Amino acid sequence: MFLMNAPPVVALQSRWEAFGQPRSFCLPDCFSEAKEDGSRASVSARVQMLISTLQRDEAALGMGHERLTQRGQRAERSRDTRLAPKPAVCKEQPEFPARGLVANCSALEKDEAGRRSPLELDSDSDDSVDRDIEEAIQEYLKARGGASEPMSQGAPSIPEPAHSSTLPIPCPSQLTPGSGSVPVGASEDQGSTSPASMSSEDSFEQSIRAEIEQFLNEKRQHENPKCDGFVDKKSDPNNSPARLRGNRETSARAALMGTCKEFIFRKPPRLTKMSTQQRNFQPKPTTEPETPVSTKLTAHRPEAAQSRGGVRRSMPARRSKRIRSSAPVHQASDSSSDDGIEEAIQLYQLEKTRKEASGDPPLRGQLKEESPGSAQPNALPEAHRRPPSKKKLAVPKVIDTTQGVLHPDPLSRLLTDSRASLPPGHAAAKSEAVCQASRLADTSTELMCAEAILDISKTILPAPMEGSDRPPSRNPLFCPQPMPPRSEGDSSNIDSDDSIEQEIRTFLALKAQVGSPQPAQGPLSSPGPSGQPGIPKVPFAKTLDLPLVCKRKRRGGGGSTTMPKKIREGRESTQDADHIQGKAQPGHDGWDPLGHNKITETPGGEAEAKEQPVISRTVGLSDTHLPQGALGKATEKESSEDKSSSLDSDEDLDMAIKDLLRSKRKFKKRCRDPRASCKKVRFGSTETRCGEKPSNLPGDWKDHRQQALRSCLPKCRGDNKDGPGRSPGSSVAEKAKMGGTGGEDATPAFLLRRKSPEGALPSTDTGASGHPPSASSPTSEDSAVDSDDSIELEIRRFLAEKAKESIRNTEPQGGPAKPEMPCRKDPTLGLQPGVCTRSQKARGTPQLAEGRRGPERARTQATGLLSQSGKGTLRAEQTARLTTALGRSEPALPKNTCRNSSAKASPPSRKSAHVHKDHSPQGSQTATAESVFGQLPSCAKVGAEAGSAGGTFHLNYGSQNLLTPNPGSQADLVLPWSDFAHQSRLSSPWVLNSGQGTVWTGVFRGEKEKGATSQAGAPPSLSSGPRKGLPFLSTQLFHFGKNVSWGGKQTSLFSPNLGLPLQAPAFSAFRETQPGHNPVFGSPHLLMKDSGNWPSRKAQGTLRQQDRRNSASEDKVLDLRYRHRVDREPQDQETLGSDASEFSDTSMEDGGSATVSSKGLKL
């Protein structure tokens, strides 16, 4: 298209002439300025033509609608005239280079003009003529803006400024009294600068000026009402970009027009306060004086220059221009888009006339322009709108006060009306159809604007955070209303770009209206606050988004539910922070931010979000009322993210995630503190309790679980949605706390927080039933809110039933009661009443928790389950994946699945024995030391107590990485805990004590240590030292799924992603070495971990199973406090060999708990 380097004489000339007449392309040609002489002559003729056309236009524009028609006529006439004098026009075009408009118009250009003469001439001449006309119109608008701006601002101007704030950028156009002058100013800038470069054409410019002045004078008289809404907008979308480029070139008027330029051109990144304000204020007076001269001077040259530089972009710009019927004048500058421009102008004029007739010319005109060109005007206007939000947020005093005061309600009404009333459906449809094409470009701009607005709202809105609860509830109320008009009218256009911006605006406007209609509108800048200035703009986009999002959320959870996920996250984080300390759910609430954050980020998070409001209510709406600003900010962010999730959601999510992570960290500390404050079960004290409650645990656990389940299930219903992502930790923490381990729960919950995405929800026995469902559904179905909700409900029911079963089972035997279900492990979970197994995986994992306390167990189990359900496959059933529990949920309660259950037959006796306090004190203390796993140690204790629960394994380790396999690994890892459990030592729950913060960093070396006598009471328990001993069943081998890092011995048996519980038979090595005692595995191996984490064993953690002989008191839980390294023969290691590697795999995978080296379990 650009024959920049083509020789002056091109054979294509004649061909192009034939094709040129269609004027389908404005070809910016860069040619040598060889034929400027003839072009100047043609320029004078062209000037005469322009004058005549301008005069005609003046007459027509004076008529009102004729202006639009004449625009097309002018374009046509200019085209016709140019087409007729193509040679002259070619000369003119070469002259343009001389003038600086077409610096490269040369003989080649002439030739091309001859070839493409219609095209070339049309493009340049059309552009210049159209742009001259446009500039004249703009100048007129400036003058009119100066004179009629007070009028339009007085009556229409309020809507207009409101528009500029709400529908903002139309705002440039609606600001056209100020902002309208901006496009004019922009063109003037070009004019002012262009004249400098075109100084050679003074006479031409002067003639143009005279014509333009006359024309503008007439237009000012006739088009004061029309041009404001019409020309301003049109000028803004089209002229703004094209002339902004010119403006960029021109530094003159930088103060006034520079601001306008920035506003128009930079509006996506930063529609600065100055740009809006200056546009609104300075451009009016300054632009008008400048307009007649500089615009006229510039009229052709800047337009020609733009026709070159701008025409190239005008190819895309034409689309936007056409799409933006709002820019018909500027579109006219694009010769190829003249027809479309004419049509758009006519339609726009009709619309404008209707608007004027309706009394809302500026508002409706702009609204309609936005709605018809919603995508493009939105791209540009919305880019403006969003920055105006920023501007309003930042400088709400000037603009927002004038624009935003009346706007929130009128804006929503106008937006609705404009969307609904868009009488020029053809224009709207046309612009919408084209907008879809321009939206692609606009989307990026709008996204940038939305991001900037979100950032600004983040910084600015925090002030109004206190009213956050209110705006969310209002939002739901208002969202549906604004949403139908916007969604219906602009569904196609708004969906990607407008929806975000409009919904934000709607949300802000609604928030402003509902919160403090007047303050939100005028003071929106201050109280509604900084975010509120943009409310007029943002609220509608927000409302649109909120209707979609809020509807889902409202259905899931109440007024606060309507709050965007991130808002809820931030609010809940605050709530969690506040409540974590003050409530039994500190960990739970603390988890809400994290798990909820993750979920919030994902569609599935909405399920959480739904319930999170419930939690917020539970936690306290005082937190929910995080500053309106926070909600508005979060809501704005969230709603925009919801629709622009693919666009700017990543950035917003990153920011939100970072914020949430920060809050989570704070919550972690807070949760730890609440754990400390909530002595529910301090691990130090829990240690003893574990021993003390061995036999009592079942009853107590049952009671706690039942209570916790009752309390947690309702909360889970409210929280599960929060919990889905965060429930693993939050549910466990909450439930455990409710069960009395609340203080400790925060740690598992915190640990789970990182696991929560995995959906390891089957955490606590008590709350397991409720939370696992939520965890499983959100984790597995983050993207499906509905499915999450239904799944969560189903899972909750199932878990509730299962918890009851578990309680029953746990009551009788604490674990061995149901060995029949190896995979389901639910009966085994019975051992751990809180087996909130995800529907499939984490059935039995919670058993472990039983041992401690209902709550504590619940937390431990929840942690274990969470870790296991990290993939949402809670192999809890396969509690066999102790490794998952170890790696993932510190409470590595493998809840010996079926086998655990079967093994539990003997364990019942051991239960009490294991439960003996030995392991718990140290392990619990260590766990307590580890804030995150503090609860886990108690779980370990619980596990000891849970000895009754049936050889459940309690991983107590302060550090999360203790045997924390990847969520997936955990899910995949299904260890034949039942097999391990079958072994008497399995019956005794082994507590993984990393309580001192020692993590199973090294390897689980399943070393058959026949001399594991040091572990007097618990042969099955791992003792690598007080901290080092892992309470693994001697026979249990943990394959953590994918990574077989332990000792590098990974049995194919446990393929990284086996995902199915390893059963005793699966552990061939284990079975090989089964001693007489161990049905599944040979001599019981003391799983010991030499890990730097374990105080006594800072070396690699090794899983060592004590000999059955050594573990003479298999019934007794290994005294983790006195975890002794039990040296066993390598035989056992060999036996566990490959399986051990699997175990190490998962724990290695766990990332956080991956401290476990990829050393294979050596049993």
Curated annotation (Swiss-Prot):
The keyword Nucleus applies. Residues 65-91, 144-253, 266-393, 463-496, 514-653, 672-929, 1073-1163 are annotated as: Disordered. Residues 515-535, 766-780, 901-910 have a biased composition (Low complexity). GO terms for molecular function: protein phosphatase inhibitor activity. Residues 783-792 have a biased composition (Acidic residues). The modification Phosphoserine is found at residue 1111. Residues 163-179, 189-201, 273-297, 860-871, 1133-1146, 1154-1163 have a biased composition (Polar residues). Pfam families: PPP1R26_N. Residues 315-324, 672-682 have a biased composition (Basic residues). Its main location: nucleus. One of its GO terms (cellular component) is nucleolus. This is Protein phosphatase 1 regulatory subunit 26. Inhibits phosphatase activity of protein phosphatase 1 (PP1) complexes. May positively regulate cell proliferation. It comes from Mus musculus (Mouse). The gene is Ppp1r26. It is found in: Nucleus, Nucleolus. Keywords: Nucleus, Phosphoprotein, Protein phosphatase inhibitor. Nude mice injected with Ppp1r26-expressing cells develop tumors within 2 weeks. InterPro entries: PPP1R26, PPP1R26_N. Interacts with UTP20 and PPP1CA. Residues 65-83, 208-236, 566-581, 634-645, 793-808, 850-859, 1105-1131 have a biased composition (Basic and acidic residues).
